[in-house]
Amino acid sequence: MKTFELYSSSICPICQRRIPMRIYEDEKDNVIYLEKTCPEHGKFEDVYWGDAELYKYFFENWNHAKYIGEGVENPHSKIVKGCPFDCGLCPQHKTHTVLGIIDVTNRCNMACPICFAYAGKANYVYEPSFGQIAEMIKLLRENSPWQCNALQFSGGEPTLRNDLPELIAEAKKAGITHVEVNTNGIRLAEDIKYFKKLKVAGMSTVYLQFDGLREEVYKKLRGRGDLVSIKKKVIENARKIGCNSIVLVVTLAKGINDNELGSIINFAIENHDVVRCVNIQPISMAGRAKKEEMRRLRITIPDALKLIEEQTGKISRYDWRPVNWPMPIAKGMEMLKGEAYPEFTMHPMCGASTFILVEEGNKNSYSYAPITKYIDVDHFAEVFWRVYYLSLRGEKTKAKLEMLKFLPDIKSKLIRELIKGVVTKGNYEALGKLMNNVIMLGIMHFQDVWNFDIARVQRCAIHYALPDGKLRSFCTYNNLYRDEIEKRYSVSIEEWKARKKKEITEYA
């Protein structure tokens, strides 16, 4: 029986043509599936969301018109073929850049079996020059109406570049407030001086690959079994240099590390002086399989939420909210402070997050609870919507009173004072102080060609800045554009080695 039904568009996994897609509920297993048919390559089925009840909870509450953005005022491409084939961003895109990504190299000192973006597989080196990267940063900062202020340097392995500290400094000089480095951590574990250079240059956060606490996990996902000690050494070195913002980034694979989520969260809590977030990324799929087989292999956002519920016993699946939940906070603060804020107008099915408040006990013991135990987050969001609409009518004093009336309802004094600081100061530093007292848990399910939903793509807020002068959404770039762009701006491995007098796995 199929009770919930919705229509969108997708692409054929084989020829990439745009095709209609149906999203529907199968009551037999409480799962949301998708099906799409290419006139040339036939029918494809996949799991869209692993829990129909959670899907409808997110979709019905956070897919309203007021959660849909208007995109950028200065798109970099025209509509010719239609989404996703004009990505640049084009006028069809509905969300501005909340996080920019720049791949500074495709070289890497690992050869992960699951990776799609390193030189050893590609047989060429993609490594934009300092000048090209400076132009990409400028491209992000020229976005209108929101000048992107958060940037991730990624790869490949970005720490293979000796000039990464200078690139970070360049981003800070251009007005980027938050600069994070996406890394496997090997160089940060081995070379504390280099780690310190990154911090001194202005690195805000280490976005650390962290798939679990057992070497068997890394053997399967990363092809080597000596990485747990390396991850722990990065944590240790972070303390030594005063870096107190590490995100543990979990590539989640069914049957490999899906039983590790509780222990990873506990590890974050034990190291909450430096760990600010655990971000979970369900692995993308490759290859064609039947519907039943895809259900066995595919792990989706609600699957992970239920695993966390089971493994922690403290964090319920209903303690999470979709990634666009902060939208009213941005709109309300914009009206109160008279300045722009990033608008989280992503599709509610793209991800979810919650926060946990950690309290220290005796003898290095910690207790924690999700933020929903201290604050009615949905009422909090509604208060900010009221603040926004009252301010629109010119009633700012009344809007501020609405906010003040809500503060006594917050059960935690710490959270109450921190939220008061965010509201009254309304700047990035105040928000950072709030984050320093809690751990964020996040999950983002990046798409592959099998579950590709154009409705999601058009609302993506994570955009690659590229040397051709365009911005492309994360899932569009990785599925449709990466190979072509990298090849266009690459050199052969032999040419790179001759120029640098180094192997491609060495620091240069």
State the predicted function of each range.
Residues N30-D51, F59-W62, K66-T183, R187-K193, ...:
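Conserved alpha-helical substructure of the radical SAM core
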Residues Y118-N123, L213-E216, M285:
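A short, flexible beta-alpha/helix-coil linker loop
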Residues Y33, L99, T205, V247, ...:
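Broad gene-expression machinery/nucleic-acid interaction feature
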Residues M1-V80, D86-G88, A340-A508:
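Radical SAM enzyme core and accessory elements
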Residues A134-Q152, R161-P282:
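Radical SAM/AdoMet-radical enzyme domain recognition
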Residues K240-E429:
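Radical SAM enzyme [4Fe-4S]-AdoMet core and its adjacent flexible, acidic
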Residues I102-V104, F116-A119, G155, T183, ...:
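Glycine-rich, histidine-containing beta strand-loop boundary motifs that form or position
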